[in-house]
Design a protein with these regions (language model features):
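Active-site region of the double-stranded beta-helix
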Residues: 16-116, 124-155
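An N-terminal JmjN-like helical accessory module and its immediate linker preceding a catalytic domain
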Residues: 1-16
Length: 156
């Protein structure tokens, strides 16, 4: 359902000239707008205004937590992902289509399906584990406290 909107967004981002530094939506010094690595397409940070109205409607519930640094992660099947890592700030991940699992530190994997979300507190090691089901996920940093009842899975 959301693939068409995401593909159009990726095409739009791909037509941009080389990113300039500093990029107001990207705190890193990377100039790549998106990259394809080990089966996963990921974008650099995207302004919320770049998303379609359908995707913005999904994000509306979380705007009160002041999200920023939106990134898309898409795969058409099983992929290796990016391995164990920690993020700066609390991370909110929303599965808008498909399915993905996350392993947080040494816990059992939790599965996110379409519409599910997960909050991972700053400093908690985690990694995504894709499945054979195509997926689209949005990741962002939140600047305000997110209560556990606002997300499907909570690792605060």
């Amino acid at each position: 359902m959301y693939w068409e909107e995401i593909i159009e967004l990726i095409k739009t981002l791909g037509n941009e000239p080389n990113s300039t530094f500093p990029n107001p939506y990207n705190e890193s010094d990377e100039y790549e707008i998106y990259k394809y690595e080990r089966g996963t397409l990921s974008t650099s940070y995207i302004n919320i205004e770049e998303f379609s109205e359908e995707v913005k409607n999904i994000l509306n519930k979380y705007l009160k937590y002041e999200p920023e640094n939106f990134q898309l992660f898409c795969s058409l099947g099983a992929s290796d992902g990016f391995g164990p890592h920690e993020d700066i700030g609390d991370t909110l991940i929303i599965c808008i289509e498909g399915q993905i699992s996350y392993i947080i530190e040494n816990t059992k994997p939790v599965v996110l399906k379409s519409g599910d979300s997960i909050l991972i507190a700053e400093g908690r090691e985690h990694m995504g584990v894709s499945s054979t089901i195509p997926r689209i996920c949005i990741s962002c940093r939140v600047n305000r406290y997110v209560p556990s009842d606002e997300v499907t899975h909570y690792f605060g």
